[in-house]
Curated annotation (Swiss-Prot):
It catalyses: GMP + ATP = GDP + ADP. This is Guanylate kinase. Essential for recycling GMP and indirectly, cGMP. ATP binds at residues 29-36. GO terms for molecular function: ATP binding; guanylate kinase activity. Keywords: ATP-binding, Cytoplasm, Kinase, Nucleotide-binding, Transferase. CDD domains: GMPK. SMART domains: GuKc. It comes from the Bacteria. NCBIfam families: guanyl_kin. Residues 22-200 form the Guanylate kinase-like domain. It is found in: Cytoplasm.
Amino acid sequence: MLPSMMVARPDPQTTSSSSHRGLLIVMTGASGVGKGTLRERWLAGQDVFYSTSWTTREARPGERDGVDYVFVTPEVFLEKVRQNGFLEHAQFVGNHYGTPTEPIEAALARGQDVVLEIEVEGAMQVKERMGEEAVLVFIMPPSLTELRRRLTGRATETPERIEKRLQRARDEIMAAHAFRYVIVNDDLDRAVRELQAVQRAEHARQRPETEWTAEDRAAVQLAETVRSTVLTTEDLQRIVNS
């Protein structure tokens, strides 16, 4: 990590341009890790298509239908599955989640970056379907103790369901090398800078290196520090045991 390095925000001319297909950035991680807050800060002011997932779970206090999720009945969701209308879909803690395909393909084709915030199982489906086009970013908790505190603080889950989420989080953390990037969300400002760097670096790599600006090179340098390959199995085990 290089918390002192400043990276310019992605240029709107590179994040929404018809000359290149847009980036497909998939943000995933354990429930309670802070994906929503991080995503809002990262994407503020950007012309990025944020895909709103469908779900069959009940809305939490403050969540808005069509903004945070599209809340549907199981019957409506399963009909969409039968129509092959999801890029990915998964069942998590008894509820269905899915990402509709058509709006994503349309945004990518017009050169607009697309961001998905989805469950890990769904992220792996996107990786299988889209290959290297999908830029997978795993958001890591600083520790399991901190993740437990965040989940408990929600006051929306039973103790049994929290334990299920924590066990799943352990498994997901140990599989972090399946993702291209891993960002530890222990400092919101730093995590936002790292996401901005990843986005700019991936755009830079679509062009010859001779065309890179100084800001592009700084972004590539910072993005390399959050590659999943930087983490050892021992690093992941320490977080799981913490």
